[in-house]
């Protein structure tokens, strides 16, 4: 079995700390070249020789490369990159450690741009995992408090942050266990299949170089085109009865022994102008670890989950800092506004914008957009410093719970406004056909718009609300923040009702303060 790691994974801890070859903000060319590392990616029964040229991945990779180049060019450079106060070197704002309200505003604008440029469709853009790693630094001392003779977990975390920041690396993550037998208690994720082979990721042995791990992890979105994979526990699985299943670490996506199984593509029209959003299929993957070596300096947690339980709020105390930052909030805002604008343009294109019931549906969608905007402003207003000096946004857990409900409703409204047009439109090849085009011009145009405009608009709506791509996005929005029911329960446990309960008890003691009881 292969147990080593290439490149940084086998480098010394000092090499990560020094990060001498600081490369600055990622560029498109550097990003694409970094993916040609022999990573073991599988899709539809075949091993992918090169993800940068495979039809299922190349459009997404090209789009990310385009955005990486934009962040290094005017007018985006000054908004998406900055000078790092710690090193004086230019870095991506995604990796900026926020030390003030102004830093948080800069990070908001950076996240807005990442999501505007990708139409709010990337749940795992490069801007997503950077705040996750940054915010773990808030608990650096607690990670360090868990002792191990081979390493300091808090120091490892800080060094890894510096390493990623200097290179502007694109991280994916994997938190959940394989969906094999959910009847097992979530605090005991040691499951068995066949000849007592354990399914959950676990430590097989310790060596002088690190720990060797085996098992499966899901669901790693964007794994085929990421550069690093952060592996940890979700709030659902944070408590374990078997300590060897308790670990958090990061490895290169091309690490030997790591197999990546991508799902079937959701798009039939790779690179098609006719379905513009489907090039943003970021893929979702299973990760299989076959005796993968994780060096000591890349471990952040081992055997003791206490810091991670605290970070995730799985101890019932609630999370006192918003570790997801702006990335998800801005993505949701862009997605909501896109769906509302498309629905409005569809209503205009078929002459129903003034219908009372249609206008009411559009107004409902606009209401959701405005509520979200005000909520984002509230999260920013509640921002403040942590004891470590790092600035954090106000709590946003309740917003993500709300959006799991609203997202499905907005998709439903878009479908209703489009009516049958969302499934019956001519293709680009139909539009190019000289024989059939006259019929399209006559029978498939809209109100004051030609058939090209109308069909392309409706196909955009189809991408959002009726295609395999759109359904995948809807499912992603429901689950990406974890089990919505668990999130609601955790919110209830930390929701302060003491004041109102006390007033109600007083009311029940004296129900008629200005009269007499009968």
Language-model features and meaning:
Residues 324-384:
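Extended amphipathic alpha-helical segments enriched in small hydrophobics
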């Amino acid at each position: 079995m292969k147990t080593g790691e290439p490149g940084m994974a086998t480098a010394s801890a000092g090499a990560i700390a020094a990060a001498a070859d600081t490369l600055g903000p990622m560029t498109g060319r550097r990003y694409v070249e970094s993916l040609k590392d022999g990573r073991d990616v599988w899709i539809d029964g075949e091993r992918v020789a090169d993800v940068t040229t495979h039809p299922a991945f190349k459009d997404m990779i090209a789009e990310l490369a385009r955005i990486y180049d934009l962040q290094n060019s005017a007018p985006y450079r000054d908004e998406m990159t900055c000078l790092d106060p710690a090193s004086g070197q230019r870095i991506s704002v995604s990796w900026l450690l926020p030390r003030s309200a102004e830093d948080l505003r800069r990070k908001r604008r950076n996240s807005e741009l990442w999501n505007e440029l990708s139409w709010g469709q990337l749940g795992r853009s490069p801007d997503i995992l950077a705040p996750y790693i940054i915010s773990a630094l808030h608990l650096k001392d607690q990670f360090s408090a868990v002792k191990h003779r081979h390493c300091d977990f808090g120091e490892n975390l800080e060094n890894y942050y510096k390493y990623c920041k200097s290179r502007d690396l694109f991280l994916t993550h994997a938190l959940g266990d394989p969906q094999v037998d959910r009847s097992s208690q979530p605090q005991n994720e040691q499951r068995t299949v066949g000849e007592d082979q354990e399914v959950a990721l676990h430590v097989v042995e310790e060596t002088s170089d690190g720990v060797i791990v085996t098992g499966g992890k899901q669901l790693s979105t964007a794994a085929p085109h990421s550069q690093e994979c952060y592996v940890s526990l979700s709030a659902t699985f944070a408590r374990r009865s078997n300590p060897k299943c308790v670990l958090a670490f990061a490895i290169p996506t091309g690490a030997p022994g790591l197999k990546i199984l991508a799902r079937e593509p959701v798009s039939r029209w790779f690179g098609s102008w006719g379905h513009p959003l489907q090039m943003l299929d970021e893929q979702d993957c299973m990760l299989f670890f076959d005796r993968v070596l994780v060096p000591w300096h890349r471990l952040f947690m081992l055997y003791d989950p206490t810091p991670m339980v605290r970070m995730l709020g799985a101890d019932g105390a609630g999370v006192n800092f918003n570790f997801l930052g702006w990335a998800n909030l801005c993505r949701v805002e862009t997605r909501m506004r896109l769906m509302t604008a498309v629905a409005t343009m569809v209503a205009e294109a078929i002459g129903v914008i003034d219908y009372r019931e249609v206008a009411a549906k559009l107004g409902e969608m606009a209401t959701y957009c405005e509520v979200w905007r005000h909520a984002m402003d509230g999260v920013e207003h509640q921002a403040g410093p942590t004891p470590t000096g790092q600035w954090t946004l106000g709590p946003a857990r309740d917003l993500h719970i709300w959006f799991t409900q609203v997202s499905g409703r907005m998709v439903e409204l878009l479908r209703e406004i489009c009516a049958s047009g969302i499934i019956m439109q001519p293709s680009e090849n139909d539009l190019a056909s000289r024989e059939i085009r006259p019929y399209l011009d006559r029978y498939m145009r809209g109100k004051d718009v030609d058939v090209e405009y109308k069909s392309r608009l409706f196909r955009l709506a189809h991408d959002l609300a009726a295609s395999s791509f759109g359904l995948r996005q809807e499912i992603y929005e429901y689950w990406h923040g974890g089990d919505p029911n668990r999130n609601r329960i955790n919110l209830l446990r930390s929701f302060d009702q003491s004041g109102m309960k006390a007033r109600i008890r007083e009311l029940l003691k004296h129900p008629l303060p200005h009269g007499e009881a009968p």
